[in-house]
Amino acid sequence: SNPFEILFIIYPDFNSLDFAGPFEMFFRIPNVKITLASPSRGNVTSEAGLVIGGTEKLANIERCDLLCIT
């Protein structure tokens, strides 16, 4: 079957706990595909300096089953 698609939208100066907790939980669920997106693709830096790399451009995402906004 198709994986359950979870999209995390990550904005600059995000709170790393708001991202890491849900990400770690969803990561452990079988048959889940997690996509990280930001307004302008690439690296996004948290308010504490944590860098999340390789995000997709939000405008290019067509669909998801669950949306998480950080």
Which positions does each model-derived feature cover?
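Extended, subdomain-level signal for the structured scaffold at the beginning of enzyme domains
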Residues: 1-70
